[in-house]
Amino acid sequence: MEYFNVGKIVNTQGLQGEMRVLSVSDFAEERFKKGSQLALFDDKDRFVQEVTIVSHRKQKHFDIIKFKDMYHINAIEKYKGYTLKVSKDNQGDLQEGEFYYHQIIGMAVYEKDVLIGHVKEILQPGANDVWIVKRQGKRDLLLPYIPPVVLNVDVPNKRVDVELMEGLDDED
C-alpha cells in the first residue's frame, strides 16, 4: 500500500496522551479530524501500526492530537520522532484546481518556457505556502504560492508555470 507523509510527532503534550505534531499535510484540519485513520511509521520508515484520531486542536505551529486507546504519556512517549502517514485510499477526493503536496514535489518549474528547476519541498510558514525549487548551479528558490507568481499547475504533465516578481530571485 502507498502512504504519504502528513506529519511528524515531535513531542508529547501533557500527561493525558496528547502528542505535538509538526504537520506537513496539505489539508491538516481534514487529515487530523476525529475519526481519521493514519499510519504510524518509525524513525527507519517502517510501518508500526494503524491509528485513529480521537481529538485534534491547533496550538501555535503545532497540531495537538490524541490516538484511540492511548490515553497516557507512558503509552505514547515511544512514538516521539515517528512519522504519521495517510494511505492513498484515505486521501479523499479533491475539488478541481486542488492537489496534494506529493503531486507537486518533483514538478518542473518554468518561467516563459525556460526550466528554472524542480519543486523539492513545500513549507507552510504562514498565510501562504512556499515552494522550494531546486535549481542547477544556483541556490534554491523560495517561491510563494500566490496567484501573481504561480500561473498554472499542470498535475498530469508535472509542470508549473510561474512569473517571478522582482526581488524573488536574488541571483539575477
From Swiss-Prot:
Residues 96-168 form the PRC barrel domain. It comes from Streptococcus pyogenes serotype M1. Keywords: Chaperone, Cytoplasm, Ribosome biogenesis, rRNA processing. InterPro entries: PRC-brl_dom, PRC_barrel-like_sf, RimM, RimM_N, RimM_N_sf, Transl_B-barrel_sf. It is found in: Cytoplasm. This is Ribosome maturation factor RimM. GO terms for biological process: ribosomal small subunit biogenesis; rRNA processing. The PRC barrel domain binds ribosomal protein uS19. Belongs to the RimM family. An accessory protein needed during the final step in the assembly of 30S ribosomal subunit, possibly for assembly of the head region. Essential for efficient processing of 16S rRNA. May be needed both before and after RbfA during the maturation of 16S rRNA. It has affinity for free ribosomal 30S subunits but not for 70S ribosomes. The gene is rimM.
